[in-house]
Structures are given as structure tokens and as C-alpha cells.
Amino acid sequence: MITSYFKIAWRNLVKNKLHSFINISGLATGMGLAILIGIWILDELSFNRYHQNYTSIARIMVNQTFGDQVSTDVAIPLPLKDELKNNFSSDFKSMALASWEWDHSFTVNKTKISKPGMYVEPDFPKIFSLRMIRGSHDNALNEPTSVVISESVAKSFFGDEDPLNKTIVFDNDVNGKITGVFADLPRNSELSGVQVLLPWSLFLQQDWVKNSVTNWGNNSFQLFTQISDNAKFERITSKIKDIGEKYYPQSKPEYFLQPMKKWHLYSEFKNGKNAGGKITFVWLFGIIGLFILFLACINFMNLSTARSEKRAKEVGIRKATGSVRGQLVIQFFAESLSTTMSAFILSLFLVQLSLPFFNDLANKQMSVPWSNPLFWLAGIGFTLFTGLIAGSYPALYLSSFKPVKALKGTYRAGRFAALPRKVLVVLQFTVSIALIIGTMVVHQQIQFAKNRPIGYDNTGLIQLGSTEEIANSFEAFRSDLLKTGVVSEISGSSSPTTDIWGNRDDFTWEGKDPSLLPLIGLVSCTHEFGKTIGWKIINGRDFSEDFKMDSSAVILNEAAMELTGSKDIVGKLITDENSNRLHVIGVVKNLIMESPYSAIKPTFFVLGKDFRLVNIKLKTGVPVSIALSSVQGVFKKYNPEVSFDYKFADREFAKKFADEVRTSKLSAFFASLAIMISCLGLFGLVSFVAEQRTREIGIRKVLGASISGVVALLSKDFLKLVTIAFLIACPVSWFFMHRWLENYTYRANLSWWMFVLAGLLALFIALVTLSFQSIRAAIANPVKSLRTE
């Protein structure tokens, strides 16, 4: 019996092909997008859950006050660990100091590769519950020369051999012993880039690290901890908050624990307070996914209820031939469920087909969780729910008709029967227009920041890590590069042009407020740095080897000049807490070295030979491949065993827009789908209205109505609904996009033309959709339509 209901339902789907296509394709698109967004959200929420101690791991962070600004950083001073251990040992199960992650060269026999690694204390593998394939958590890093490598690094060097106790040379001159191998960390771990762990005891032998053991002013290290079983993050934070103020009162440091579960989604801080982070995108895309799914469901329900009003006579015939109400209820529900199940199956195919594109768009490596029972439970549950809700109107309302009334055709929809459908159409286009506006605002903000002058020329500028060999023979290295004819200039620097790796707060100058402790970026460089990057001197002069006094010279950016309060700063002195005197020789235009959306940090540029990077300006007109080959030849002359790893400055700068560009692309993708689903629904509704008014259209044409008049008749009511949607979407979009733009110091204005353009675009798309079916109805033969009616 049940089978017959679904057979009849299938026949009805086939009979009404256009109606079925619109219903199934629209609902499948909405479901598919909701599944994709759901997979993306689950991936974001899964970050760091790989680590068994996920809920009890934290990193120590610090808020420091510089003038009227509070800076938040994960870098802490070296003596903090012992202070915490001596005073609050009962709150911590384990603690481990760590360096920052950077590339090291590793050599086994004659094989040499460069891999990211970090120096860590022995408890590090245990805190993060690394899955040890060889060796043990407890003693893997206990020896002074212990090295723990990832499984992929082990395969690169040893294949299937056991690497334990084998010798590995790192950074060209340190002999280490492999004492452990850990399973590669998944991409959804914050530590996924780390492939080698080096012994902390060896790190402590470096002079600058030794000098930091008691220095509370040198925030250059990381401290990870696993708290005790009964401890609470908030309670520990309240205890340790002011522990460093007595040692370094200048910046009023306040320490706190950030739980590992917040590292990925809550990574942004503003003026000492957590300002969210990627959790914003989780909420945003989650809401968008629900809205688009809602739009698809609206279409389905709208068209289902609209079509059901034409089936009153069918209900009368079936009742007259003996059908009872219960059978009709089951029949209508069977038809609705057949549609939703077909849509769900189609949505799974769409998801599988579009997943590579979506992964590329979202910069992910996601897959559909086919084996997860919750996935099927949620999908089938939602499908059944949607089918039951959409089928409830015809099932419960139409099945209640008296057969005589239905057969006579005296059934008429109520005066306000179309009102719910109109409201739902308005909702659909409100969401669609809002998404279009949001996409344009995000795009404008990106272009606004991209068009901001960066203060230097990054075209053809490459940067590579310096080595001891290059630093010791820099002038010879520079000379050899210039002789190749493919390079216009070379320089060394302590920071890349796309970041500032050094900061100080101890500088003073004439007229400075003693209570003011601004954080100033400090970049050490060689004489040719300005020429290499093409900065612009606006006052004074550049560094020059003709002036021996330049060894104590400093060049300020505009932001630093404004900080001093003197436009005539050139020629004046700046000193630090060690009474070192720097004389200002020049001022350069602001360089965007950090976020292009933020205010420029005051920065000092000084001469120094202790640089970590080499900046190379390639000559224009020389093919890049040829230029790089020549540079590599010189590099290998000085570093025959070090891999030639370089980065283009313009590409590194472009990465600063990655999140916003991704958001813009996803928003455009979502907006396109939303408007497509809305137009599918509009097309279905105008088809239904044209079918309902066939006799009226025929009479009007017989009486002389033009095609344009008939098109206007069928379209005007729907265009009014789109206009109402536009009027609602504008203030809603303005409110949310204004709030979003407030996250950026350097931001675009909300322009009125974007709202108008979004409205006109929505009206145009709606008009095209309406015109197709309206014109078809208008050119139909009136005699045929009147005879049919």
C-alpha cells in the first residue's frame, strides 16, 4: 500500500517536470551548500583536538601598556617560567619553554634538506601528547644533543630504516642524535608546521639566550603549560596576572593563560581584550549557510503550497471515488517526501562534485564524512522534517474539503492566501541583496587597502635567509651578485619588508613625556637597504659609507617622526636605556611592513651587521628564471650545502590580504547561489501565476492587450516585492558591514552607490527571470487558452 503512494508521487513529479525541476534543483542547491558550510565549520572547530590534553593545555600570553595602547603578545621573558614554577607549582602539571619555529638545515650522510624546527624543553612532547613512533615522551629530549624528528623527515633521510640513535647534523655544525620519531601532526593542529624538535639545553648556549635568563624585558620566547587536573584557567590567570610587574614596571605586564581550544578561533586581541578571530567567520558563514538553506526551503514550500491550490478538484474526485482523508494525507506527504529525498540525494552528488572547488576557495583539504552516522542522521532528519512541513498544507488542509464543493470548483483561496508567499519572496531577496552588498563592501575594503601606498618598491624584490657564511663575507657576496648583471642592489636586514621582528620601548628624546612608553619597531640593516627596497627620503639623507658616524645613525619613518612631536627631528639625538646615543640623519615615508589595515608602527632603522635576511633587487627586463638561476649560483658558492629558499616580497605582501580575499570569494559564491535560488523560486511562482490567469490573459489579448502590457501585468507585483526587499536589506546591510569595517583602523567608507547597484542588480536579475515566463505566457494563442479554460 505504501509503495503505491510513492509510485503515484513519482508519476506526479514526472508529469509536472518544470515544477519538479525547480523544486528539486533549488532545494538540492541549498542543501548542498549547507553541507559544504557544515563540513567547513566542523573542520574549523576540530583544530587542535588531535592533542589528547587539548582541554588542559595553554600558552602564557602578556598584555603590556605602551602609552595609551595595550599590546598583546605570545612572546614572554625567559625568567617567567621559574617564577611561575616557584610560586604556583601546584597549578601546573607541566611547563615547557620553546623558541619560535624557523627553518634549519639538516644533514644525514650527504643528504641535506631544510625543515622547520624549534628548540623545546623536554616536557614539550608530553604536554602535546605527540604520538611517538620511536622513542618515548619521557626521555626523548633529555640528552644535550637529542633530536626528535617527524615521520616524514625520517622517511626522507632513512626510508624504512630505524633512525633511532643515528647522527644528524643541523645548522651545518651541530652533531645531534635522533632519540625519537613522532607521527606527522595533522594540518588542523597549530603545530602542524613543526617537523623537528631540538634540545633546549643547546639553545641556552647561545649568547643572546644566556643573557635573557634574568632579563624580564626581553620577550622573545614561548611558554606552554598543562594545568593540573583540578585547576581552572581563569583562577590561575587571576593569580599570575601581576607576577612580572615588580621586575619590569615600565610596561606594566599582565600575564594570562590562553587555552589551546581558543588558539585557532580566538587569536585576535584589541587593546588587551580578546576580539575574536576566525570564530567571526564560523558564525558568519554558519548564518549564511542557514539563510541559503532557508531560501531553498522557502522556494519548496512556496511552490508546493501554490501548486496544491490547483488540486482541489483532484481531491474532490478522489473522495467521490471512495478515498478517505487519511489516504489523501499520506499521498500528499509521500509526494513531498519524494521531492525532498530526491533533492537530498542530488545534493550529495553536488557536494562531491563541488568539494575540490570549495576546498580551493576556502584553502582547505576537507572531505565528506561519509562514515559518520551523525552526518546521515542530520541529513536524513532534516530532509524528513522539510518534507513533512512543506507537505502539511496540502495534506491537512486540502484533504479536509467536502467532495461536492471541490468538484463544483467553488473552492477559492482566501483573500490573504498569497500573503505568506509574498512575505517569503521578500525574505529571499532581502537575504540575496544583503549578500550582494556585503560582497561589494568586502571587495572595496580589499581594494582600498591594496591601493594604499606601501612606501617602497616590492617588484622584483626577493628575500632569502642569511647564513653565517654570507654574514661573514657579505661584501664579497654582494660584489659577486652585482657582477652577474641580473641584480641592481643587495642589502641585509634584521626583518623582512613585510614584518617587523624587533621592537623596543626604551628610547627617549628631547621633549618626550617620561610616562610615555611607545612600542617602536627596530630594524637593523646594511647601508644599501634603502636603495634595495626603494624607500623615499622626505627629509635628511640615506645611510652612506662616506659618513663614518653613520654607525650610530638612525632613520625614522613618518610615524616615528610624528611620535617625537618634531618635524625638525633630523640632527637631533635619540638615546636608549643603556645611554647609547643615536643621531637622526633622515626621515622616510611610511613603509607598510605589518598589516595594511592598521596604523603604521613608529619604526627606527639603524645600521648593523647582525642581519637575518638578504634583500636582492632583480634588474627589470631580465627574465626572472634566468635571474634566479644566476643568484642561486652565487648563493651556492658560499653555501654549497644549504638549499636556495627565497621569497618574493610582493607575493608575501599579497598574503596579508588572504583572509579578506577568501572572504570576498566565498561571499560572492554564496551571494550567487542565493540569488540563483531566489530566481528559481520566482520563476516557479510566475509560472504558477501565469497558469492561474490563463483565461484572463486570453481575454485581455482578444480585447487588444499588447505583449508588453501582459508582461507588466504578470511582473509588477513581483518587482514590488523585490523593491521592498531592497528597502529592508539596505539598513540591515549598512549596520552589519559598518560593524565589520570597525575592525580595521584603515578602512573604506560605505558608499551609497554600492547599495543602489545591489538593488538595481537584483531588480535586473528578477526582471530577466520574470520576463522569460511572462513573455511566453503573453505570446500564447488566446483562442487556444480560452478553449482550454
Where are these regions (language model features)?
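Hydrophobic, regular-secondary-structure patches
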Residues: 44, 58-113, 123, 155-160, ...
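Membrane-proximal juxtamembrane linkers immediately C-terminal to transmembrane helices
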Residues: 42-65, 88-90, 131, 190-191, ...
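Short, strongly hydrophobic transmembrane alpha-helices
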Residues: 16-45, 418-445, 456, 681, ...
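Small-residue-rich transmembrane alpha-helices
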Residues: 32, 36-39, 256, 336-403, ...
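Intracellular coupling helices
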Residues: 6-22, 26, 296-339, 400-411, ...
